[in-house]
Amino acid sequence: MADWKGPRYDAGWLYRRIKWGTWDELGLYDNIESASINRSAFDTLKTSGSLKYFGTAPDEVDALALIYTFRDRNGETVEQRRATVLVESDEPDYTSLDGGGVRQSGSAKIYSLLKVLSDTKLKVPYTVAAGANAIAAANKIITGAGLRTNCQSSGYLLSCDHTFAPDNSLLDVVNYLLDAAGYGSADTDAYGAVILRPYVEPTARELAWTFANDETSTLMPGISSENDWRNTPNIIVLTYETDDETYVAQARNIDPESRASLPSRSWRENSTVEQVSELDGDTQDERLENLKALARKKLLDGSSEIQYTKVKTLLVPVEINDAAGVLYSGIKRQGAITSIDTSCTPTAETNIKIREFIRRDLLVDVTGQVIAV
């Protein structure tokens, strides 16, 4: 097993061309001078970044693999692929050389392979029928676009038809289906396969890494933190519409012990209104009660204080949405990684942001009504 906590020797990056469609590994690019990889759980494409090159720009049809490599203190050579991306190059620059000749160079943006889905519009209305298996339908769309999947199957069936407009993208459809089935939004693994798996609460995830300032530390000096409680909603309104009626449920944070509650914030109301596309229940009363329960859950989830901890570290084998801990000079935190920004240098300096939900039992008022159309 590779030793990521000890010294690293001969560290650097490899940039390999990956054949589109077959995903075979082709030759290495030796003209990429620098690169950066930005991973964000909140970005639709999840992965972006940039690179600089000289000579001919990297191919824009084939994919590019960015691979971190080093030799650990046990002599083991580590090659870890960090991302497989698409490249879009800017127009090149030309520089005159002493003694004649011209040097071509340029920069390029990189994106995850989800860009294939986000760039492909439906062009005509598209309906996913009631009774369809949501995850099977999402998997079919992705593989139909030429991508591979890492898919965990599900038995969830859609309860009603859903039609998408022509200007929606394939990624819009896929993420709708994933959300309906209780899955996390689409991401790609380091090899470019699209990951389809159920959403798991951060507190239920196995800890992937602990950043500690001890003898095995990978940390660079200093950490920082922020708390976003002022932006948390204190009112959640959910609506669900049928051809005959509209259901409305409202949940209000009325807990005087909560900094974000209506009693504490006075006139500073922070409300969120969402439309629900799927609602279980055989009767009107059951559907309304289910909507009220969902509004309460969303308010409790949304009213949790969000504590962000930012660490600067050598690159370690973690991914966005992994659970991670911080033990630093008496500070103890644990949450989910929301962003990883890596500079593709021998030190592979990486900025990681960890989000922790601080949940408390709240006093919540929930109301609901059914409005006839």
List the predicted regions and their residue ranges.
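Polar/acidic, low-complexity leader/linker segments enriched in S/T/G and N/D
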Residues: 1-31
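Surface-exposed cap/loop segments at beta↔alpha junctions
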Residues: 2, 55-149
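Extracellular/virion structural assembly segments
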Residues: 22-70, 116-117, 121, 128-132, ...
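Oligomerization/assembly interface segments of phage tail-like spikes and tubes
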Residues: 37-56, 102-115, 238, 301-312, ...
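Extracytoplasmic/secreted envelope proteins and their assembly/folding machinery
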Residues: 135-139, 171-174, 235-236
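Glycine- and charge-enriched low-complexity intrinsically disordered segments
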Residues: 358-373
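Short beta-strand-centered interaction patches in the first periplasmic/extracellular domains
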Residues: 2, 78, 94-117, 153-232
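Acidic, small/polar-enriched beta strand-loop surface segments
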Residues: 1-10, 175, 200-347, 369-373
